[in-house]
Amino acid sequence: MAMKFIAPMAFVAMQLIIMAAAEDQSAQIMLDSDIEQYLRSNRSLRKVEHSRHDAINIFNVEKYGAVGDGKHDCTEAFSTAWQAACKKPSAMLLVPGNKKFVVNNLFFNGPCQPHFTFKVDGIIAAYQNPASWKNNRIWLQFAKLTGFTLMGKGVIDGQGKQWWAGQCKWVNGREICNDRDRPTAIKFDFSTGLIIQGLKLMNSPEFHLVFGNCEGVKIIGISITAPRDSPNTDGIDIFASKNFHLQKNTIGTGDDCVAIGTGSSNIVIEDLICGPGHGISIGSLGRENSRAEVSYVHVNGAKFIDTQNGLRIKTWQGGSGMASHIIYENVEMINSENPILINQFYCTSASACQNQRSAVQIQDVTYKNIRGTSATAAAIQLKCSDSMPCKDIKLSDISLKLTSGKIASCLNDNANGYFSGHVIPACKNLSPSAKRKESKSHKHPKTVMVKNMGAYDKGNRTRILLGSRPPNCTNKCHGCSPCKAKLVIVHRIMPQEYYPQRWMCSRHGKIYHP
């Protein structure tokens, strides 16, 4: 178990040093640059500003032939402008305000020169008629970018209305949607150090904003909207990615506000407004007997308004793997169906899915300070597998009642764990709060460190980086296969644990993979 550390403000300015084992006090372990950059990520929130000296690196799409009248095809002009801007350091590709530019499918490919900004102040719109699209996979695709910013006060409109028509039908009381033929609006692949800020995304034919194989991403102050009945129009989808920070976003669509898929870890969501939609979903995981892994997800501050679900974890029968180290706290529900839902029997087939023995393990999930009203009788539903019960489920300070004011209920099937404080509705088979058994490997950390690796103070938000290593992990900088060390990012109140992929030893300048 990681050593707890509460730092007074005076210590925030201290430099954090990860000390090596007692046998070698001179060796130091440093985070590799990408993780360090993530920990310092708030410093990247400043607005992109350009001096007069930088003005030569502004690339206005109009100068490359784009016509912002909402009629002309500007696809080639956007592509040409991108290629020119991509080659220049500190470039800004500008879509000017008060104009509407129609484009077809575009592939914005990297790598590009550092500090590249795509600033959208006007409207970028897709073709309304699906027959006019070049393909039905992705509208605006970004790939292989590092240190890239997509920002502005403009709109990116997927014009999805004609795509949605006839895509869904009801079979045996269940809505079945054909989602194979509609494109995603925006997708990022194989990119690091991204900032998405300030934009309004709307009416995507299918998913609005998707990230695959990305790392170190901040999404700040964007809005995503689509009609309540628009099929599969997820707001933000994340898969096979890590180190994400979503802050102060507003999402209301016909599906998940945020969906976190397999291979994702270290996802922080703060101050989200969600609704309409299907809430925040982890999953679905384990489809077609696949293995799935999701870990270290922290939702701190969210409001769900008239959503079909609130905080949902969904897995298919027959899968394997694990969803773990998940924290939901400081959440408000307003007339939301299924405010708290774990469903290990997720199924979209028109007929009932076959019962299977294996399942994705769900463990170490915390719900803290969840309040509001439920539109369904069972405000808490823990529907866990009998062959793979949910472990270490923790409920603390829960107050959920029906929208009508009546008492709600809790459904608990095969979920084991604890409760503390007032939990309404009460859940059977959960024990009163008890001390968790300490892991032997982390019972007595060898060292604790604190250095200038992400420790800083900004307003009311303080972050301290802590580290600990198991007692049998010595001389880390001298081994070829060092054991894992645990880092804890103290994020407001609730710590978020994080296992780095690489360590760099400053003594030798080598990178080791734990």
From Swiss-Prot:
Keywords: Allergen, Amyloplast, Cell wall, Cell wall biogenesis/degradation, Fruit ripening, Glycoprotein, Glycosidase, Hydrolase, Plastid, Repeat, Secreted, Signal, Zymogen
EC number: 3.2.1.15
One record GO biological process: cell wall organization
InterPro entries documented for this protein: Glyco_hydro_28, PbH1, Pectin_lyas_fold, Pectin_lyase_fold/virulence
Subcellular location: Secreted; Plastid, Amyloplast; Secreted, Cell wall
SUPFAM superfamilies, per database record: Pectin lyase-like
Molecular functions (GO terms): polygalacturonase activity
The keyword Iron belongs to this UniProt entry's keyword annotation: no
GO cellular component: amyloplast; extracellular region
Reaction(s) the record says it catalyses: (1,4-alpha-D-galacturonosyl)n+m + H2O = (1,4-alpha-D-galacturonosyl)n + (1,4-alpha-D-galacturonosyl)m
KW Plastid (keyword) present: yes
Active site: D255 (proton donor), H278
Enzyme class: hydrolase
Propeptide: 23-45, 434-514
PbH1 repeat intervals: 214-240, 241-262, 264-284, 294-315, 323-344
Residues of this chain annotated as glycosylated in UniProt: N460, N472
Signal peptide stretch: 1-22
Family per record: Belongs to the glycosyl hydrolase 28 family.
PANTHER family membership: PTHR31375
Annotated protein name in UniProt: Polygalacturonase
